[in-house]
């Protein structure tokens, strides 16, 4: 399961969603100020500075570039 924590008007959030949809990955998209607050984000992703923040199988992996690298290693 992939969890994407994003925000509106975020090209890399959109790219992460598109990659997951295209490849048929099981994923959930959570949006800032709808599904979580900044404070909750920082609790779950200490040191987070950019969007999206992504978790794969319960492990924080980083942003879109890290998701793309994970995808290419499969």
Please place each PLM-identified region on the residue numbering.
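Thioredoxin-like thiol-disulfide oxidoreductase module
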Residues: 31-48, 73
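Local sequence-structure signature of Cys/Sec-based thiol-disulfide redox active-site neighborhoods
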Residues: 1-26
């Amino acid at each position: 399961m992939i969890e994407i924590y994003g925000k509106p008007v975020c090209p890399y959030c959109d790219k992460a969603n598109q990659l997951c949809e295209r490849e048929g990955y099981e994923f959930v998209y959570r949006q800032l100020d709808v599904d979580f607050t900044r404070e909750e984000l920082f609790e779950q992703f200490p040191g987070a500075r950019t969007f999206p923040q992504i978790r794969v199988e319960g492990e924080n992996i980083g942003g879109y570039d890290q998701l793309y690298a994970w995808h290419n290693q499969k």
